[in-house]
Amino acid sequence: MAVRLSLPAPAKLNLFLHILGRRADGYHELQTLFQFLDHGDELHFETREDGQVRLHTEIAGVPHDGNLIVRAARVLQEASGSTQGVDIWLDKRLPMGGGIGGGSSDAATTLLALNHLWNLGWDEDRIAALGLRLGADVPVFTRGRAAFAEGVGEKLTPVDIPEPWYLVVVPQVLVSTAEIFSDPLLTRDSPAIKVRTVLEGDSRNDCQPVVERRYPEVRNALILLNKFVSARLTGTGGCVFGSFPNKAEADKVSALLPDHLQRFVAKGSNVSMLHRKLETLV
């Protein structure tokens, strides 16, 4: 008998991003601080007995078998030896190439949903290790806690930080992470810092100058948002954000922005809404 489950795939913000150097394998050593948003995609799962993995929602420009959702399901199927399959539907709300984790979050939600639906009983560490094979940001979503990240982003230290409201502006661009990290003008020698330093305000996003230069839409969004609040790029962008002490103030600034700018207001959270939902499942 088919079993159904619906779960959120929350957005995240990089509250800062420092690049410490480039490794011999081409990846970059970095430090960043992840916090979740109570806003994201929604995925719907229904088990099937024939072992097939089917995503019924098409994403423009992304082939079915290349979608991280499908890849996550299949890599878990292979690693666990499960003979079960799944039908998946996606309510897509997060932009692609936005720097707020849409694809990685969808993959993490898929891993955790199927761990539950297929009765695998995998622990957090095992799921996170598998998630890392899909992308450096996937483990933070599978673990579901705000975290100070190091290495290529996979070394996570949970943190308890303020949970403000955020106004996130979504420029209509698709930023290529690979292009940003290969840009010759990217800062790659930032000194390592402590979480305390970040919370005191002494931090930045090393990718921001490169993204602003390559994508005028992002630069213009930052200029507009900076009129009202200290604004910053998240990840490699193109989304930019500012923080507020309450929803009313975030909504007030949102209403002042030009109509053509896509944006949303969401609460920051140190425990992802995915994990809050999982805790309610028996």
UniProtKB/Swiss-Prot annotation:
The keyword Cell cycle does not apply. The keyword ATP-binding applies. The active site is at K12, D137. One of its GO terms (molecular function) is 4-(cytidine 5'-diphospho)-2-C-methyl-D-erythritol kinase activity. It is an enzyme of class 2 (transferase). It holds the Pfam family GHMP_kinases_N. Pathway: Isoprenoid biosynthesis; isopentenyl diphosphate biosynthesis via DXP pathway; isopentenyl diphosphate from 1-deoxy-D-xylulose 5-phosphate: step 3/6. It catalyses: 4-CDP-2-C-methyl-D-erythritol + ATP = 4-CDP-2-C-methyl-D-erythritol 2-phosphate + ADP + H(+). SUPFAM superfamilies: GHMP Kinase, C-terminal domain, Ribosomal protein S5 domain 2-like. GO terms for biological process: isopentenyl diphosphate biosynthetic process, methylerythritol 4-phosphate pathway; terpenoid biosynthetic process. Disulfide bonds: none annotated. Belongs to the GHMP kinase family. IspE subfamily. Catalyzes the phosphorylation of the position 2 hydroxy group of 4-diphosphocytidyl-2C-methyl-D-erythritol. This is 4-diphosphocytidyl-2-C-methyl-D-erythritol kinase. It comes from Pseudomonas paraeruginosa (strain DSM 24068 / PA7). The lineage of its organism: Bacteria, Pseudomonadati, Pseudomonadota, Gammaproteobacteria, Pseudomonadales.
